[in-house]
Swiss-Prot record:
The gene is ald. This is 3-succinoylsemialdehyde-pyridine dehydrogenase. It comes from the Bacteria. GO terms for molecular function: oxidoreductase activity, acting on the aldehyde or oxo group of donors, NAD or NADP as acceptor. InterPro entries: Ald_DH/histidinol_DH, Ald_DH_C, Ald_DH_CS_GLU, Ald_DH_N, Aldehyde_DH_dom. Pathway: Alkaloid degradation; nicotine degradation. It is an enzyme of class 1 (oxidoreductase). It comes from Pseudomonas sp. It holds the Pfam family Aldedh. PANTHER family: ALDEHYDE DEHYDROGENASE, ALDEHYDE DEHYDROGENASE-RELATED. Catalyzes the dehydrogenation of 3-succinoylsemialdehyde-pyridine to 3-succinoyl-pyridine in the nicotine degradation pathway. Keywords: NADP, Oxidoreductase. It catalyses: 4-oxo-4-(pyridin-3-yl)butanal + NADP(+) + H2O = 4-oxo-4-(pyridin-3-yl)butanoate + NADPH + 2 H(+).
Length: 477
């Protein structure tokens, strides 16, 4: 069992006084696999003050100094990918061979490599006539991250913050805290200066809220639910600090009538079920021509039944458990709601898959004949539940897609790239994937509407951690 009860504050591993202990549960076995400490406002204050003391020195380091440290982090990270992947599998259930090793752990490394690449070529100053425009580190940052892609979400914040010259306090999810602890070890090993990076475990009320509210925190970057994001914004408001939010989604996957139907449905089902549906940008609404609904249902059922649910340590497992008992119950409630509202259940349903007597395993579930008024069409379920929604024409498909309080991602499949591009222009989302295109580490990630504000990834995420200063008369008259 992992004993991760220490915090990392001011370059030291410290056992926090007065902190409660919390058990970390392996969602595949429902057994205790670790212990952490739940911090308090006092621990947050210690970490923030350490970050504040470190800021003046770290913010004045040269680009080359920060780049050298980032490159050391990348080398150390790469050497520990297997260890990190196993920790992710243990803490939140991602299948080791098919997800944690090829995607979850390398995604974290990818953000550090991208941050180093951006920093290498980034110009922090530019001239506008006699005025000099300077980009400077934003300050002390409070970083609050979720459990679904634990290290990916951490690295998407920590890497650009380090590159920009900020100092920080990280609060990872108490449900999946192992990979954050391993990253702190890497920082300690490579010699990140004391106070530049601090780790305080805890829950939202005990650590997240005081971190967002702390007067010495200049910027808060939060990824999680829209409900929690509003609480973070409220806590941060009295100090008028910058707040960047990456929140929920209910992404539409528009399959146009000229698309390769089998390819589009297969990709849509598999992408939806990836990570057991626990991705904010999951294509959870599949919009299909009414004339092809029967064929889509047949294909979707076929591809759904191919998915292997089981022990995340087995190499043939496609999807593992949901990350917690609470999430399992939420998904079950949503499936019940779909049945009660009269949606057509074509695959899956309530309870665990056959042969799995324990663990937070849910059946990959597909509903069809879903309309936009139904709860399952509007709620972010965050589990392996796909809604198939028929439309009459392209304009109606776009209207259905945009009829959501969320606006994180969209997906379009078409035999005509030009047609797909035209639909993409009309979607009110922060990203659109055309014909199965993958995510891009250099592209911005973030949403419209209640999916949040600000952007992560690439230079766009890097610039979130910079302030802009205008120095007039810099060149003289």
């Amino acid at each position: 069992m992992r004993d991760y009860r220490e915090f990392y504050i001011d370059g030291q591993w410290v056992r926090p006084k007065g902190a409660r202990e919390a058990e970390v549960i392996n969602p595949a076995t429902e057994k205790i696999v670790g212990l952490i400490s739940l911090g308090t406002e006092e621990h947050v204050d210690l970490a923030v003050r350490a970050a504040r003391r470190a800021f003046d020195g770290w913010s004045r380091t040269s680009k080359d100094q920060r780049l050298e440290l980032l490159e050391q982090v990348c080398r150390a990270f790469e050497s520990k990918l297997d260890e990190i992947a196993k920790a992710i599998t243990e803490e939140m259930g991602a299948p080791l061979v098919q997800l944690a090793l090829p995607l979850q752990a390398p995604a974290g490394l990818g953000h550090f490599l991208t941050a180093a690449s951006i920093l290498r070529d980034y110009d922090f100053e530019e001239s506008l006539g006699t005025t000099r425009v300077v980009r400077e580190p934003a300050g002390v940052c409070g970083l609050i991250t979720p459990w679904n892609w634990p290290l990916n979400q951490i690295a998407a914040k920590v890497a650009p913050a380090l590159a920009a010259g900020c100092t920080m306090v990280l609060k990872p999810s108490e449900i999946a805290p192992f990979s954050a602890y391993l990253l702190a070890r890497i920082f300690d090993e490579v010699g990140v200066p004391p106070g530049v990076f601090n780790l305080v475990n805890g829950d939202g009320p005990g650590v997240g809220a005081p971190l967002a509210a702390h007067p010495e925190v200049d910027l808060v970057s939060f990824t999680g639910s829209t409900r929690a994001g509003t609480l973070v914004s409220t806590a941060a408001a009295p100090t008028v600090k910058r707040v960047a939010l990456e929140l929920g989604g209910k992404s539409a996957n528009i399959i146009l009538d000229d698309a390769d139907l089998e390819t589009a449905v297969k990709h849509g089902v598999r992408t939806m079920m990836l990570n057991t549906g626990q991705s904010c940008n999951a294509p959870s609404r599949m919009l299909v021509p009414l004339s092809k609904l029967d064929e889509v249902e047949h294909l979707a059922e076929h591809f759904c039944k191919e998915i292997v649910v089981g022990d995340p340590m087995h190499s043939d497992t496609n999807i593992g458990p949901l990350a917690s008992g609470m999430q399992y119950e939420k998904v079950q409630d949503c499936i019940r709601q779909g049945v009660a509202e009269g949606a057509k259940l074509i695959c899956g349903g309530l309870g665990r898959p056959d042969g799995l007597e324990s663990g937070y395993f849910a059946q990959p579930t597909i509903f069809s004949a879903v309309n936009k008024q139904m709860y399952i069409a509007r709620e972010e379920i965050f589990g392996p539940v796909l809604c198939i929604m028929p439309y009459g024409d392209e304009n109606e498909a776009i209207q259905i897609a945009n009829d959501s309080c969320y606006g994180l991602s969209g997906y379009v499949s078409s035999g005509s790239l030009e047609r797909a591009r035209n639909v993409a222009k009309q979607l009110r989302t922060g990203a659109v994937h055309l014909n199965g295109a993958a995510l891009d580490f250099t592209a911005p990630f973030g949403g419209y509407k209640q999916s949040g504000n600000g952007r992560e990834w690439g230079k766009y995420g890097f610039e979130e951690f910079l302030e802009i200063k205008a120095v007039m008369g810099y060149e003289g008259s």
